[in-house]
C-alpha cells in the first residue's frame, strides 16, 4: 500500500483552482465587466454609423424565349435551314436560344464587360479622386463587386449574378443596368456573327448558282451543237422527212440527222427559244440568293436572357452587420473587463 508523502496535501491545495474565489472576484468586479462590455458595444455601434455600407442585390437568369430574340431568331434559323439543305449542319447542334444565352453568360461573367460597365456609370465617376492609382484600385474593387455564380444543371440551379453597392437603391438599379448592358454586348456580338455568316452564305450561294448556270449552259451548248451538226448532214443528204422508226429521245447524236430537216429545224428553234434547262434545285437556290442579297435586318437591342429572379432592393445590408458587431465587441469588452477585475484583485 502506497503511503502519502509528507506535505503532499498542502501542495495540491496550492495548485487547485479556487472556483468560488474566482466567481467572487468577478462578481466584485462586475461594474468593470459590464462597463467595458457596454463601452465596446457602443464603440461598435458608433462604427456602424460611419463605416461604408455594403448592400447586395441578386438576379437569376435563364435562356430567352423566341419572342425575346425577335428578328434575330428567324434570320439565324434561315441560315441554319440553308446549312441543312447543303448538309453543312450537324443534327445535334444547340438551339438558337441556347447559343444566344451562352453568349450572354459569357458577357455577364466577362472581366471586360464589368470594366466597361463601371467606366460608363455615374456611380464610378462620382467616386473618382483624380489619382490614377487610387482610381484604378477603386475600379478593381468595383469589378470584384459584381460576382457571377454559374449554375449547376445537374442540381437544377440556374446562373445568378450579384452586385454590391453602398446603398440599397444603387444595388438594385446598377444590377438591372449591368444585366441589360451585358445583354446588349451579347446582342452586338451575335449580330456581328450573323452578318459574317450571312455574307459567307451569300458567297457560297452565288458560287453554287453560278456553277449550276455553267453546267446548264454547257449542256445547252452541247445540245445546240449536236442538233446543228445533224441539221447540216440532213441538208447535205436532202433528208426531208424522218428516215427512222426509233423515237427521237433514243437516237444517239451520231444518228440524229435521220430525223429529217424539218424536225431538226423545229427542235433547233424550240431549243433556242427555251434556252438552257434548269432543275427545281436551281430555282430554289435562286430564290434563296435573292433573299440573301437583301442582307440581314439587325436589331441591336434584342434580349438574350429572361429573369427567373428579378433584381430588387435588398432589405438587409451585408456590411456592417450592426447586431453582430455589437454582440461580438460587447463580449470582447466583457472579457477585457474581467481581466481588469482579476488584475485589480491580485494587486490588492
Swiss-Prot record:
Keyword list (alphabetical) reads: Cell inner membrane, Cell membrane, Membrane, Transmembrane, Transmembrane helix
Pathway(s) per entry: Bacterial outer membrane biogenesis; enterobacterial common antigen biosynthesis
Which effects follow disruption of this gene?
A: Null mutation abolishes ECA(CYC) synthesis.
Subunit structure, as described in the record: Probably part of a complex composed of WzxE, WzyE and WzzE.
The GO annotation for biological process reads: enterobacterial common antigen biosynthetic process
Give the protein's function: Modulates the polysaccharide chain length of enterobacterial common antigen (ECA). Required for the assembly of the phosphoglyceride-linked form of ECA (ECA(PG)) and the water-soluble cyclic form of ECA (ECA(CYC)).
Give GO terms: molecular function aspect only. Answer: protein tyrosine kinase activity
> Which family would the database say this protein is a member of?
Belongs to the WzzB/Cld/Rol family.
Q: What is its main location?
A: membrane
The molecule here is called ECA polysaccharide chain length modulation protein
